[in-house]
Amino acid sequence: MHGLLLAGLLALPLNVLAHPTESHSSGVSRRAIDITSYRLPQISKYTKSDAVPKQDGESFTTSSTGDDNVSSGDYVTTATNWLKKTLPKATYRLVNDHYIGDSGIGHVHFRQTAHGIDIDNTDFNVNIGRDGKVFSFGNSFYDGEIPKANPMVKRDFSDPVNALHGAIQTLNLPVTAKPENVKAKPVEGKENFKFEGTSGALSDPKAQLVYLQKDGGLVLSWKVETDVGDNWLLTYVDANKNDQVHSVVDYVSAAEYQVYPWGINDPTEGNRTSIHLPWLKTLSTDWHIDGKGWYPTTRGNNAIAQENPTGHPEYENNYRPKSPLFIFKYPYSLAMTPPSSYRDASITQLFYTTNVYHDVLYILGFNEKAGNFQINNWNKGGVGGDFAILNSQDGSGVNNANFATPPDGQPGRMRMYTWNASTPERDGCFEAGIVIHEYTHGVSNRLTGGPENSRCLAALESGGMGEGWSDFFATAIRLKPGDTRATDYTMGEWASNRPNGIRKYRYSTSLTTNPHMYVDADGLTSVHAIGTIWASMLYELLWNLIDKHGKGDVTKIRPVLKNGVPTDGRHLAMKIVLDGMALQPCLPNFVQARDAILDADKNLTQGSNKCEIWKAFAKRGLGVGAAFNQTKRTGSNELPAGC
């Protein structure tokens, strides 16, 4: 998963949202290549709501549904004019993934261009408030000199096939591309190609000519896309020196059902029960239809779940349980072995947990417009065709899990493994926290920077927060009625057979039990280690809001909202964290993400929880005076005036 990390083992890089794995599948050789050394630079800026310059002139009104007598172009025009005013000399294009979220904020994203070519790691996101004015914005546009020579005139760049070979050779990719067999077929867009005649990748590799912002300048590069299973890579190969790789992004982050019900994290917390019609009314009707068919198996609009013992990429024809009566009840006990003997129960549990989480997130705002995972978007916005592919007992590894998040319109892919630290071995599908952790990688990658941009958590601190968000949601969902702020939680305890879980510290509001502070991130190179710090801050936030607003009935699945605002502190924390993801810039750092959460609360509740939020972050060193620096962060316990 972009997620769970076993102590003492190396974490997987970037977006392989994964725990370290004993993998025998295709992928980048970790011993030969450390792709984390090719991370994108962290250059984004975020202007929070109270720092946005005063605006004059006409505005429009958004609504929580975007259905007012207002055309979608109004807020896009406002955002475009803001960009023109802020950076009058910039050239850019509008990314076609703008939407008005359920919180009433319009989200608009732009990509900088030079000579009509994308500068691929430059983004400008504008958030338009309910009053029709700019609420906040993020910016990573290049402000240096644009190359005067247009490379398209003299065709001053290599053939894309050579760039593909450069990526394969430099990163030691398990892809075969013999020159006599490979053809670069043009597809829609300028200098955009799909390669035919290769083998080893899960889909045809692609290449697009782009600029990359690096070391204070622009380098012309081929962006080569290769999905090799454990890694789904964007490799930026120099357009002239094809043996030089400038950067790498990895999209992968390491009826009736008899299941462990929602809120039961693993078999130690409760028993399996039969649940009838568990889906929430979220416009998806039920989990087994997609507008084209009704499937009496673990397939539907949101997900398709199956076993995958070979670890191969094919999934359509893999085994999945079938029930003409839609009764998915199968035997399972902790003593059963081998795992294949309870594959039906495993697949059913994975399908159930993922679909419930999809529905909860939908109510909290991660819907079609925001880039969620659905085959059919029911004419509600976004791009369909992208349910989540869920592989139970995936044979490509053990002691791990991962989730790959391509842009909106392409299916996400979750691989759940078995864990062999106990006898008999354990199946990660039965630990809900692992499933939720992995799926949350898809959520944070789709929300940050817009649904069409899946590289916005590719920097070190951004990727760390991706791990932290995943741990946070997995923990918030498993709260029990008797829990208090004195309750501590682990991650991955059951599957790994480790009483203290797989993080350095338990999640706790006690600085004795968990002493993590912001400055602890200095010198860390693991996204999992950095993520534990971020999740520790969010755990403080969770309990500050619960102490103020209550937990609600944690035995109920459906969040209760009043005027779009969750009535309990648990779901309120989840909501403003989700909204903050959509507000923050591409490649955010801790300080920017904190400010985006404060802005999310300001928009949602008029800032009524400002002090609770500040106290959570300041307790762990992310107070008013905190400042980001890659190697030397500044910690602060200072609170703003009035708190």
From Swiss-Prot:
From start to end residue, where is composition biased (Basic and acidic residues)?
Answer: 47-57
Cofactor(s) the record lists: Zn(2+)
| Cofactor binding, per record | Binds 1 zinc ion per subunit.
Arranged from A to Z, the UniProt key words for this protein are:
Glycoprotein, Hydrolase, Metal-binding, Metalloprotease, Protease, Secreted, Signal, Virulence, Zinc, Zymogen
Q: What is this protein called?
A: Probable extracellular metalloproteinase 4
Q: What is its EC number?
A: 3.4.24.-
According to its UniProt entry, this protein's organism is Arthroderma benhamiae (strain ATCC MYA-4681 / CBS 112371)
Mark which residues the record calls propeptide: 19-254
Give the family from UniProt: Belongs to the peptidase M36 family.
Q: Per the record's keyword annotation, is Signal included, yes or no?
A: yes
Spell out where the chain is glycosylated: N271, N420, N603, N629
Cellular component GO terms, alphabetically? extracellular region
Catalytic residues at E438
Sorted alphabetically, the Gene Ontology BP terms of this entry are: proteolysis
Pfam families tied to this protein: FTP (PF07504), Peptidase_M36 (PF02128)
- Which Gene3D superfamilies does the record match to this protein? 3.10.170.10, Neutral Protease Domain 2
Entry GO MF terms: metalloendopeptidase activity; zinc ion binding
* Ranges of biased composition (kind: Polar residues): 58-69
> What job does the chain carry out?
Secreted metalloproteinase probably acting as a virulence factor.
- Residues the record lists as binding Zn(2+): H437, H441
Renumbered to this chain, region (Disordered) spans 47-69
Where in or outside the cell?
A: Secreted
Signal peptide residues on this chain, from the entry's feature table:
1-18
Q: Give the first-level EC class, as a single word.
A: hydrolase
**Mind telling me which CDD domains this protein's record contains?**
M36
